Amino acid sequence: MTLKNMLVIQYLAFGTIVALCSCSDDDIDIHRVGLPETVNQDAVAYVEQNAKDTKVIENYDFTDGRNYVMSVGENSPSAAISGQTVEDAKEGLGALAVNYTFAAKSISTEPEYVTMKEIWGNYRTDLSFHPLGLSLWIKGNSQNPGILRVMLIQDSKMEPGIQMENQYFQYINKSILQQDGWQKLIIPYESFQLYKGLAPDDKLNLSKVFGYRIDIVNEKDESGTGTVYLDALEQVTSYQHQYEKKGKFSSMFIQLNKVYYENPEYDDWETYFTECKKVGIDTWIVQYSVGYGAENTISWYSGSTVGWNGEGVQTECPIIDKIMNAAEKTGFKIILGLNGGDYNIEKLDDKWTYDVLLARNEVVAGDLARKYADHPSFAGWYITEEFHDAKYPAGWQEENKRKLLSDYLTRVATFAKSKCNKPVYIAPALWRGMPAEMCGEWFGALLKETENVDYMYLQDLGGRSLVDVRIDLPNYYGYIKKACEEAGVKFGVDIESFFYSYYPPVDYRAKTWAELEEQLAVASQYTDLITNFSWATFKPGYDSFEGYRNYYNSLK
C-alpha cells in the first residue's frame, strides 16, 4: 500500500477525511465522518421563489411494490427499522410511517443509523433538468431521537451499462425530526456537501446521480425509539412548461389480431380511413405483417411464403389485403411492418441472434414487395422488433451490443429498400435507462452507425404510469432529437393512447382525451411527426378520438 493510500487529512469544515485503499492511486475513497448541519435558509428561499414544475420521485402511497429498501446501517447491527403505509397523508393516498430503534451500539467510528435507499435503473429520475432541489413532507414529534440525513448517490464516471456508488453527498437537518405536525422540507441542491468520494474536491453532478438515501442518524449515541412520517419526495425544477405549438397526429399504429379478421364489424376499413382523414391522420403503420406473440403462426396477408413455423402450421388472415384495397380507394397511406419477432435478451451479444431475425424479415419483405411494391398506398417499411435504452433485464447500452444492433438495423433496412425503395421507420421505447444527456449520446452513437433508417418515432411510455410527462419527456426529447438530427434521421414521437399499471394494478384501458392532450402538447414542442399507439384505444366513438376530433376542429 502506498503512502498516498494511507493518507489521513484533517478537514476543518467536515471533520476527518480518510483516504481508503482502492484499485489504483487515481481512485481514492474519500470519507468524511463529521455531521455538519447544512441547512441554508437563503437557498431555501431561492428555491421557493423560483420553483415551477415538480416531479414526484416517491409518493409513499403503498408499502407493497415500493422502489426503496429499508435497512440498518452497516455499522448498526443492533438498530431496527420498519415501515408501513398509513392514511395520515399530506398528499396522495397514503404516507409512510417509519418506526426505528437505536441501541447506541455502533461498531465503527460513525454514529449508528437506519436508512431507506433507492437506486434508479430504468424509468429513472434525472435531477439535472432545470435543477433547484428536492422537497419532502415530514411529520415528526418532540421525542424522536436522531437527526435527518439525505444522501444523493453519484457515479461521476458513469458509462452506459455501468454505474457504481462512487460518491455520496449529504444534507443534514438536526431539528426537523423533532417538529410536530407536517412540515414541508425544501432541500436545495447547493446544501449537499461531499460525504464520500474518490477525491476531496469531488463535485455534485446531478446528471450522474442515480439514487438517494434517507437516513436517521443517532448523533448523540443514545438508545431510544421514534416514528417519522414521510410523504411526497419531489424533484423541484425551475422549468415552466409552455405549449406554444398546437400539435396534431399525422399517423397511427394498428396491431393486427384475429378479432379484426373474424368479426365483420371490422371489415369497413374505408370508413375508418375516412374518419381518420377528417382529423388529419392520413397514414397507418401496421406494426407487423407476420405473427406476434400468441398469434406467431399467422401471416396477415395472402400469398405468404413464411416457413419457419413448420409445414402446414402457418395460416393466413389477410387483413392487410383488405386494408391496402381500402387505402387505395380513400387516398390513405400504409407503412408495413415486417416480421413480428423479438430479440433474444439472453443473447444480445451474439450475432447469430440477429442473423435469424434478418432471415425472417427478408422473407416477409420479399413477400410484401411482390404484392405491394407498385401499390399507390404503400408508403414505407417498419422494422417491428422493438429495442430500447434500458439497463435491465437486458439491453444494448454496452458498445458491443449497440454495434450489433446498429448492424442489424442497417441490414434489415438495406434489404427492404433493395426490394422497394421506400422510407424505413423504427420506434424504440424510451425506458430512461440512462440520464437524459447520456441517453442522447447513446442514441446518437447508434444512429450514426446505422444506415438506411429514415425515421425514428420514440415511444413516450406515457401509457404505463412510468413517466412524468412534464419533466421527464421534455428533458429526454431535447437530447434525443438532437441525436437524430446529427445522424440525419427524422425525429418523431409515438404517443401511447392506452393506460395500464402493474402497481397499483390498473387493467389495460383506453385513455380519455383529457389524459392524452398533454402528451400531445409536449411532443408537439419538439416535432410535427407524431404518431399514436394505437387504433385499439383511439378509434371513432372513443373519448380519446372524439375529444381529439373536437380539438382538431378548433384549430381550423
Functional labels for PLM-detected ranges:
Residues I335-K347, D355, G380-E386, Y408-G440, ...:
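Aromatic-lined carbohydrate-recognition surfaces of secreted/lumenal glycan-active proteins
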Residues Y266-Y343, E399-I426, R470-A483:
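Aromatic-lined substrate-binding rim segments of carbohydrate-active enzymes
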Residues D27-K245:
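Beta-rich carbohydrate-recognition modules and glycan-binding surfaces
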Residues G340-G341, V364-E399, T531:
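Active-site groove signature of glycoside hydrolases
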